[in-house]
């Protein structure tokens, strides 16, 4: 199977959508035409994307759903759990804790906050910790991801502190563009931008 780093970004994004389709189907086999119809894309594009995987379709039968799912799970690292911390003890953190990240191979191991008055309070099953113990927790749980939910004015400084203490990837919910060292993974989650997409589609 091709390493994820060699995949074109557009292919990577589509493979995530294919995985979602496979999770929903109850059939043992599925064709590229069926996937294409569901996602309203060209079947040739589906077949081209699947050429990156060690999973061959059968003529007039399609792809083995279970085999294809395993290939995609391996590609996305779903079978290897990665630990994540949440920084920012607020309603957004509560919303994140209500989600099942195990489907992505991710486990939340701790919640932190920059405000000392929130330390010791509970969000779900987690007692909020102070940032003074961040490095110790990162080492103990081998946490690699931080979901950043702090206020905009604290976003850059907090992100820099997280990287300094050993975090490798930041899932950024602050709405602020982060300027971090090369090699640090940053994924921006801007809900406003998603709404702009919806508004654009409503115009059509």
Swiss-Prot record:
The keyword DNA-binding applies. Gene3D superfamilies: NAD(P)-binding Rossmann-like Domain, Winged helix-like DNA-binding domain superfamily/Winged helix DNA-binding domain. One of its GO terms (biological process) is response to redox state. The keyword Manganese does not apply. Pfam families: CoA_binding, Put_DNA-bind_N. PANTHER family: REDOX-SENSING TRANSCRIPTIONAL REPRESSOR REX (PTHR35786), REDOX-SENSING TRANSCRIPTIONAL REPRESSOR REX 1 (PTHR35786:SF1). Homodimer. Modulates transcription in response to changes in cellular NADH/NAD(+) redox state. Belongs to the transcriptional regulatory Rex family. This is Redox-sensing transcriptional repressor Rex 2.
């Amino acid at each position: 199977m091709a390493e994820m780093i060699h995949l074109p970004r557009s292919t990577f994004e589509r493979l995530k959508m294919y995985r979602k389709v496979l999770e929903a189907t109850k059939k043992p086999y599925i064709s590229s035409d069926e996937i294409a119809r569901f996602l309203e894309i060209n079947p040739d594009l589906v077949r081209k994307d699947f050429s990156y995987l060690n999973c061959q379709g059968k003529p007039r039968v399609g792809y083995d759903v279970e085999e294809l799912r395993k290939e995609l799970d391996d590609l996305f690292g779903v079978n290897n759990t990665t630990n994540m911390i949440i920084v920012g003890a607020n309603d957004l953190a509560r919303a994140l804790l209500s989600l099942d990240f195990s489907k992505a191979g991710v486990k939340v191991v701790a919640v932190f906050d920059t405000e000392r008055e929130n330390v010791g309070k509970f969000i779900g099953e987690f007692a909020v910790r102070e940032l003074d113990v961040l490095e110790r927790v990162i080492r103990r749980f081998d946490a690699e991801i931080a979901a950043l939910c702090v206020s905009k004015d604290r976003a850059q400084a907090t992100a820099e502190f997280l990287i300094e203490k050993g975090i490798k990837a930041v899932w950024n919910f602050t709405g602020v563009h982060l300027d971090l060292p090369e090699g640090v993974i940053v994924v921006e989650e801007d809900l406003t931008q998603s709404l702009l997409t919806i508004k654009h589609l409503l115009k059509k």
